[in-house]
Protein backbone atom coordinates (compact mmCIF):
# COMPACT_ATOMS: atom_id res chain seq x y z
CA UNK A 1 0.00 0.00 0.00
CA UNK A 2 2.85 2.37 0.90
CA UNK A 3 4.47 1.67 -2.47
CA UNK A 4 1.26 2.68 -4.27
CA UNK A 5 1.01 5.98 -2.36
CA UNK A 6 4.69 6.76 -2.98
CA UNK A 7 4.36 6.08 -6.71
CA UNK A 8 1.30 8.33 -6.96
CA UNK A 9 3.10 11.18 -5.17
CA UNK A 10 6.23 10.78 -7.30
CA UNK A 11 4.30 10.57 -10.60
CA UNK A 12 1.38 12.80 -9.65
CA UNK A 13 1.56 14.94 -12.80
CA UNK A 14 1.65 11.81 -14.99
CA UNK A 15 -1.42 10.30 -13.31
CA UNK A 16 -3.35 13.59 -13.27
CA UNK A 17 -2.75 14.00 -17.00
CA UNK A 18 -4.04 10.47 -17.63
CA UNK A 19 -7.04 11.16 -15.38
CA UNK A 20 -7.89 14.26 -17.44
CA UNK A 21 -7.62 12.25 -20.67
CA UNK A 22 -9.83 9.52 -19.17
CA UNK A 23 -12.45 12.09 -18.17
CA UNK A 24 -12.36 13.65 -21.63
CA UNK A 25 -12.82 10.35 -23.48
CA UNK A 26 -15.54 9.18 -21.07
CA UNK A 27 -17.42 12.49 -21.08
CA UNK A 28 -17.58 12.72 -24.88
CA UNK A 29 -18.71 9.08 -25.11
CA UNK A 30 -21.38 9.51 -22.42
CA UNK A 31 -22.82 12.67 -24.00
CA UNK A 32 -22.96 11.08 -27.47
CA UNK A 33 -24.55 7.91 -26.06
CA UNK A 34 -27.20 9.96 -24.23
CA UNK A 35 -28.10 11.87 -27.40
CA UNK A 36 -28.04 8.93 -29.83
CA UNK A 37 -29.43 6.30 -27.45
CA UNK A 38 -32.10 8.64 -26.12
CA UNK A 39 -33.33 9.50 -29.61
CA UNK A 40 -33.37 5.83 -30.66
CA UNK A 41 -35.28 4.86 -27.49
CA UNK A 42 -37.88 7.60 -28.03
CA UNK A 43 -38.20 6.69 -31.71
CA UNK A 44 -38.74 3.02 -30.79
CA UNK A 45 -41.47 3.93 -28.28
CA UNK A 46 -43.30 6.02 -30.87
CA UNK A 47 -42.96 3.46 -33.67
CA UNK A 48 -43.28 0.10 -31.93
CA UNK A 49 -42.99 -1.99 -35.12
CA UNK A 50 -39.28 -1.23 -35.32
CA UNK A 51 -38.58 -1.72 -31.60
CA UNK A 52 -37.85 -5.47 -31.75
CA UNK A 53 -35.48 -5.35 -34.78
CA UNK A 54 -33.63 -2.36 -33.31
CA UNK A 55 -33.26 -3.99 -29.89
CA UNK A 56 -32.09 -7.26 -31.48
CA UNK A 57 -29.36 -5.44 -33.41
CA UNK A 58 -28.19 -3.55 -30.31
CA UNK A 59 -28.21 -6.74 -28.21
CA UNK A 60 -26.15 -8.53 -30.88
CA UNK A 61 -23.56 -5.74 -31.06
CA UNK A 62 -23.34 -5.74 -27.25
CA UNK A 63 -22.23 -9.40 -27.27
CA UNK A 64 -19.12 -8.61 -29.34
CA UNK A 65 -16.02 -8.60 -27.06
CA UNK A 66 -14.59 -5.10 -26.58
CA UNK A 67 -11.14 -6.04 -27.90
CA UNK A 68 -12.74 -7.50 -31.04
CA UNK A 69 -14.82 -4.35 -31.51
CA UNK A 70 -11.68 -2.22 -31.36
CA UNK A 71 -10.08 -4.55 -33.90
CA UNK A 72 -13.04 -4.11 -36.27
CA UNK A 73 -12.94 -0.31 -35.94
CA UNK A 74 -9.18 0.24 -36.40
CA UNK A 75 -9.28 -0.26 -40.23
CA UNK A 76 -12.13 2.27 -40.42
CA UNK A 77 -11.04 5.01 -38.02
CA UNK A 78 -7.44 4.16 -37.18
CA UNK A 79 -5.93 4.12 -33.71
CA UNK A 80 -6.35 6.72 -30.98
CA UNK A 81 -9.12 8.49 -29.12
CA UNK A 82 -11.62 8.59 -32.01
CA UNK A 83 -11.81 4.80 -32.30
CA UNK A 84 -12.02 4.45 -28.52
CA UNK A 85 -14.92 6.92 -28.34
CA UNK A 86 -16.80 5.18 -31.17
CA UNK A 87 -16.43 1.81 -29.41
CA UNK A 88 -17.51 3.23 -26.05
CA UNK A 89 -20.58 4.88 -27.59
CA UNK A 90 -21.59 1.61 -29.27
CA UNK A 91 -21.40 -0.29 -25.96
CA UNK A 92 -23.18 2.50 -24.09
CA UNK A 93 -26.18 2.40 -26.44
CA UNK A 94 -27.80 -0.73 -24.97
CA UNK A 95 -28.50 0.56 -21.43
CA UNK A 96 -29.39 3.98 -22.81
CA UNK A 97 -31.82 2.73 -25.47
CA UNK A 98 -33.31 0.07 -23.19
CA UNK A 99 -34.02 2.42 -20.28
CA UNK A 100 -35.37 5.18 -22.52
CA UNK A 101 -37.72 2.77 -24.26
CA UNK A 102 -38.77 1.10 -20.98
CA UNK A 103 -39.35 4.45 -19.29
CA UNK A 104 -41.52 5.71 -22.14
CA UNK A 105 -43.50 2.46 -22.24
CA UNK A 106 -44.16 2.49 -18.49
CA UNK A 107 -45.96 5.84 -18.59
CA UNK A 108 -49.55 5.44 -17.39
CA UNK A 109 -51.82 5.26 -20.45
CA UNK A 110 -54.53 7.13 -18.53
CA UNK A 111 -52.20 10.14 -18.26
CA UNK A 112 -51.69 10.08 -22.02
CA UNK A 113 -55.42 9.77 -22.65
CA UNK A 114 -56.13 12.67 -20.28
CA UNK A 115 -53.58 14.89 -22.04
CA UNK A 116 -54.93 13.92 -25.47
CA UNK A 117 -58.47 14.61 -24.28
CA UNK A 118 -57.41 18.11 -23.25
CA UNK A 119 -56.29 18.77 -26.83
CA UNK A 120 -52.55 18.06 -26.59
CA UNK A 121 -50.78 17.12 -29.83
CA UNK A 122 -48.67 13.98 -30.15
CA UNK A 123 -45.49 16.02 -29.72
CA UNK A 124 -46.89 17.82 -26.66
CA UNK A 125 -47.83 14.49 -25.07
CA UNK A 126 -44.33 13.19 -25.79
CA UNK A 127 -42.46 16.25 -24.52
CA UNK A 128 -44.69 17.38 -21.64
CA UNK A 129 -46.10 14.08 -20.34
CA UNK A 130 -44.23 10.96 -21.45
CA UNK A 131 -40.68 12.30 -21.32
CA UNK A 132 -40.90 13.90 -17.82
CA UNK A 133 -42.52 10.75 -16.40
CA UNK A 134 -39.93 8.52 -18.09
CA UNK A 135 -37.01 10.69 -16.98
CA UNK A 136 -36.31 8.87 -13.67
CA UNK A 137 -35.97 5.55 -15.53
CA UNK A 138 -33.87 7.22 -18.23
CA UNK A 139 -31.62 8.72 -15.55
CA UNK A 140 -31.13 5.27 -14.02
CA UNK A 141 -29.96 4.10 -17.45
CA UNK A 142 -27.61 7.07 -17.82
CA UNK A 143 -26.17 6.38 -14.38
CA UNK A 144 -25.36 2.72 -15.07
CA UNK A 145 -24.15 3.55 -18.59
CA UNK A 146 -21.79 6.26 -17.29
CA UNK A 147 -20.19 3.88 -14.77
CA UNK A 148 -19.79 1.20 -17.42
CA UNK A 149 -18.24 3.69 -19.88
CA UNK A 150 -15.71 4.97 -17.33
CA UNK A 151 -14.65 1.41 -16.51
CA UNK A 152 -14.54 0.29 -20.14
CA UNK A 153 -12.49 3.35 -21.16
CA UNK A 154 -9.54 1.64 -19.49
CA UNK A 155 -9.03 -0.53 -22.59
CA UNK A 156 -8.54 2.55 -24.80
CA UNK A 157 -4.78 2.38 -24.25
CA UNK A 158 -4.61 -0.88 -26.22
CA UNK A 159 -5.27 1.08 -29.42
CA UNK A 160 -3.06 4.06 -28.67
CA UNK A 161 -5.66 6.23 -26.95
CA UNK A 162 -5.11 8.07 -23.67
CA UNK A 163 -6.64 7.63 -20.26
CA UNK A 164 -5.81 5.71 -17.10
CA UNK A 165 -5.61 2.51 -19.11
CA UNK A 166 -2.15 3.73 -20.17
CA UNK A 167 -0.95 3.34 -16.57
CA UNK A 168 -2.56 -0.11 -16.30
CA UNK A 169 -1.08 -1.28 -19.61
CA UNK A 170 2.35 0.11 -18.77
CA UNK A 171 2.23 -1.55 -15.37
CA UNK A 172 1.37 -4.92 -16.92
CA UNK A 173 4.05 -4.75 -19.63
CA UNK A 174 6.80 -3.64 -17.20
CA UNK A 175 5.67 -5.92 -14.37
CA UNK A 176 5.05 -2.84 -12.21
CA UNK A 177 2.17 -3.91 -9.95
CA UNK A 178 2.01 -0.53 -8.20
CA UNK A 179 1.53 1.28 -11.52
CA UNK A 180 -1.29 -1.10 -12.49
CA UNK A 181 -2.99 -0.69 -9.11
CA UNK A 182 -2.81 3.12 -9.13
CA UNK A 183 -4.44 3.23 -12.58
CA UNK A 184 -7.12 0.73 -11.54
CA UNK A 185 -7.86 2.49 -8.24
CA UNK A 186 -8.18 5.89 -9.92
CA UNK A 187 -10.70 4.46 -12.41
CA UNK A 188 -12.67 2.90 -9.55
CA UNK A 189 -12.57 6.16 -7.56
CA UNK A 190 -13.70 8.17 -10.60
CA UNK A 191 -16.58 5.73 -11.20
CA UNK A 192 -17.69 6.02 -7.56
CA UNK A 193 -17.65 9.83 -7.65
CA UNK A 194 -19.64 9.94 -10.90
CA UNK A 195 -22.10 7.37 -9.51
CA UNK A 196 -22.64 9.54 -6.42
CA UNK A 197 -23.21 12.67 -8.52
CA UNK A 198 -25.72 10.90 -10.76
CA UNK A 199 -27.50 9.50 -7.68
CA UNK A 200 -28.06 13.07 -6.42
CA UNK A 201 -29.24 14.24 -9.86
CA UNK A 202 -31.55 11.21 -10.14
CA UNK A 203 -33.28 12.01 -6.84
CA UNK A 204 -33.81 15.65 -7.80
CA UNK A 205 -35.20 14.70 -11.21
CA UNK A 206 -37.69 12.27 -9.61
CA UNK A 207 -38.91 15.07 -7.35
CA UNK A 208 -39.18 17.73 -10.08
CA UNK A 209 -40.73 15.44 -12.71
CA UNK A 210 -43.71 14.72 -10.46
CA UNK A 211 -44.23 18.43 -9.81
CA UNK A 212 -44.00 19.36 -13.49
CA UNK A 213 -46.62 16.76 -14.48
CA UNK A 214 -49.07 18.07 -11.88
CA UNK A 215 -48.62 21.59 -13.24
CA UNK A 216 -49.20 20.40 -16.81
CA UNK A 217 -52.44 18.58 -15.98
CA UNK A 218 -53.99 20.77 -13.31
Annotated model-derived regions:
Residues 12, 16, 50-53, 82, ...:
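Alpha-helical membrane-protein architecture signal
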Residues 15-43:
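Transmembrane alpha-helix signature in integral membrane proteins
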Residues 17, 21-25, 74-95, 179, ...:
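Loop-to-helix entry region at the N-terminal start of transmembrane alpha-helices
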Residues 27, 90, 123-155, 178, ...:
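Transmembrane alpha-helices
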Residues 40-73, 88, 98-102, 106, ...:
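Cytoplasmic-entry segments and transmembrane alpha-helices of multi-pass inner-membrane transporters
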Residues 48, 105, 181-218:
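C-terminal transmembrane helix and the adjacent membrane-cytosol boundary/short C-terminal tail
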Residues 74-75, 152-181, 186, 213-214:
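Glycine-rich helix-loop "coupling/hinge" segments at transmembrane-helix boundaries
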Residues 100-138:
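Short cytoplasmic-facing helical segments at TM-TM junctions of multi-pass membrane proteins
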Amino acid sequence: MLEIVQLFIQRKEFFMNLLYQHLQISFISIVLAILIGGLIGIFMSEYKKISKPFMSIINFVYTIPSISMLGFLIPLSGVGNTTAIIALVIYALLPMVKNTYTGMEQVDKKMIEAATGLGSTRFQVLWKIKFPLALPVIMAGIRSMAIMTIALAGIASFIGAGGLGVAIYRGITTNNTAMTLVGSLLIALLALIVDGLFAIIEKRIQHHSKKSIKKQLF
